[in-house]
């Protein structure tokens, strides 16, 4: 047992806390993972104390040695908190005092509080993991873009309300998911820029420090571009946690939309994709089954990520300034969100990268469900018919086909003319899937030339994101 109980308070109290309070307060079972960040903060704080004339050269050297020794033991897996330790901060101070003695080790706490300490190191932790998650999202974008590139000009039925709508390129559909995921990466970058400018170190418990410390210097040493403008805000705000939790939840939602499509497309009724054996599972009783477990888990974990966000927001609601112990509850939900995404995204990327698309079946289904009706209406517009009338005429064509049990292209010239004199034989030029997709050649459209441009644009953006991530 060390020379400190692992608690950073006590002089004002005649006795120790009850065992029940100890059990409730203890957080080392989840915040111990912050040890490397706490040690980095302590090194920066020791340097600030030295610059302020509060540590001798010898004291600074000994503190650095002790902190490095603890870091080596943590990396080796031999550094452990004691049951008496309240949190990671108290545990590490106790262990540091054991390492360098109370005369030197006891000097490190000057000028800092757990309040500014945890707010800062939590930001550094989340910034590191934001970069990891962003890289994994980009890997998923690469997998989707690779499938889009391989699909070429293959077509599929585009859907709204899950009903046949208009033919689109398979690549166009896959790239739609890429753009949503790239916005998630943009959100992580935006979040990081805000967090980087706001290091809480130096805020103390809430009012700042009287010891002449250098918050900007500590901020720079820890990778921040600036320090908190308001010490109360620096210690009490957790919007950076909530915003991070939102982005992780949005990533989960975006992945779940892809997952739902994979689940549907892999059914016999759709038959659009075949799952690779390595990325699917079987049944304990039904020998024929090939289950999309990764996609289903992605769909389920999206709910978990949303739950973490909503629980965190409920914790933060109506907290008065400044720090409150409620904020101990801010870490577990976000730790869980980080862990969830960092295990989910690589698995989901593997699933997507190995999907085998049945492009022949997709092409067969692309014109069905009267998906070329909009092309008929737009052809009429180009022939001078007002769209309101053109819409009615195209709808009448669909109704006639339903009565006859045929598709639009199966109507004869005479049947078209019976529906409307404006439907001359020239309408047949738009009654093909290839003609339909090629005609939609405005920016963002599904025409093959535009999709190729889109893919090139997206690839450049991904490369730019990777360069910034290093």
UniProtKB/Swiss-Prot annotation:
S-S bridge residues: none
A cellular-component GO term for this protein: cytosol
Pathway: Amino-acid biosynthesis; L-arginine biosynthesis; L-arginine from L-ornithine and carbamoyl phosphate: step 3/3
Pfam families named among the record's database cross-references: ASL_C2, Lyase_1
Record's keyword terms, sorted: Amino-acid biosynthesis, Arginine biosynthesis, Cytoplasm, Lyase
UniProt-annotated location(s): Cytoplasm
Matching InterPro entries: Arg_succ_lyase_C (IPR029419), Argininosuccinate_lyase (IPR009049), Fumarase/histidase_N (IPR024083), Fumarate_lyase_CS (IPR020557), Fumarate_lyase_fam (IPR000362), Fumarate_lyase_N (IPR022761), L-Aspartase-like (IPR008948)
EC class of the enzyme, as a word: lyase
Catalysed reaction, written as an equation: 2-(N(omega)-L-arginino)succinate = fumarate + L-arginine
Main location: cytoplasm
EC number: 4.3.2.1
Database matches in PROSITE patterns: FUMARATE_LYASES
Gene Ontology process terms (BP): arginine biosynthetic process via ornithine; L-arginine biosynthetic process
GO MF annotation, one: argininosuccinate lyase activity
Protein family: Belongs to the lyase 1 family. Argininosuccinate lyase subfamily.
Name of this protein: Argininosuccinate lyase
The organism of origin for this protein: Nocardioides sp. (strain ATCC BAA-499 / JS614)
């Amino acid at each position: 047992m060390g020379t400190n109980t692992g608690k950073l308070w006590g002089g004002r109290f005649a006795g120790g806390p009850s065992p029940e309070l100890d059990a409730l307060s203890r957080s080392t079972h989840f915040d111990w993972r912050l040890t490397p960040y706490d040690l980095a903060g302590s090194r920066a704080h020791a340097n600030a104390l030295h610059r302020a004339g509060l540590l001798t050269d010898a004291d600074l050297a000994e503190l650095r040695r002790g902190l490095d020794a603890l870091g080596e033991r943590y990396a080796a897996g031999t550094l452990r908190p004691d049951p008496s330790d309240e949190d990671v901060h108290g545990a590490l101070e106790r262990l540091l005092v054991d390492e360098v003695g109370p005369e030197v080790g006891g000097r490190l706490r000057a000028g800092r509080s757990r309040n500014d300490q945890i707010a800062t190191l939590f930001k550094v932790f989340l910034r590191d993991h934001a970069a990891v998650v962003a890289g994994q999202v980009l890997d998923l974008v690469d997998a989707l873009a690779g499938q889009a590139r391989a699909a070429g000009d293959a077509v599929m039925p585009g859907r709204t309300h899950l009903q046949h709508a208009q033919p689109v390129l398979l690549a166009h559909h896959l790239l739609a998911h890429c753009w949503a995921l790239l916005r998630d990466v943009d959100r992580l970058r935006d979040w990081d820029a805000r967090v980087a400018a706001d290091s809480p170190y130096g805020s103390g418990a809430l009012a700042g420090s009287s010891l002449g410390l250098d918050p900007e210097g500590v901020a720079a040493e820890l990778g921040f571009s600036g320090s908190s403008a308001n010490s109360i805000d620096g210690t009490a705000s957790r919007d950076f946690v909530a915003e991070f939790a939102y982005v992780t939840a949005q990533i989960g939602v975006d992945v779940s939309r892809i997952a739902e499509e994979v689940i549907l497309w892999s059914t016999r009724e759709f038959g659009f994709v075949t799952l690779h054996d390595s990325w699917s599972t079987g049944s304990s009783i039904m020998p024929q089954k090939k289950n999309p477990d990764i996609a289903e888990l992605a769909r389920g974990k999206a709910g978990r990520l949303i739950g973490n966000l909503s629980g965190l927001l409920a914790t933060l609601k109506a907290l008065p300034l400044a720090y409150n112990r409620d904020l101990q509850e801010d870490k577990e939900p976000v730790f869980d969100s980080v862990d969830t995404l960092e295990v989910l995204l690589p698995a989901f990327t593997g699933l997507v990268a190995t999907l085998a698309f049945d492009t022949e079946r997709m092409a067969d289904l692309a014109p069905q469900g009267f998906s070329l009706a909009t092309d008929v209406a737009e052809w009429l517009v180009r022939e001078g018919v007002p769209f309101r009338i053109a819409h009615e005429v195209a709808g009448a064509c669909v109704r006639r086909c339903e009565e006859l049990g045929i598709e639009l292209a199966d109507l004869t010239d005479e049947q078209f003319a019976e529906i409307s004199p404006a439907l001359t034989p020239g309408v047949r030029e738009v009654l093909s899937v290839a003609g339909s997709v090629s005609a939609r050649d405005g920016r963002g459209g599904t025409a093959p030339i535009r999709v190729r441009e889109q893919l090139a644009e997206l690839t450049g953006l991904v490369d730019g994101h990777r360069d910034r991530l290093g």
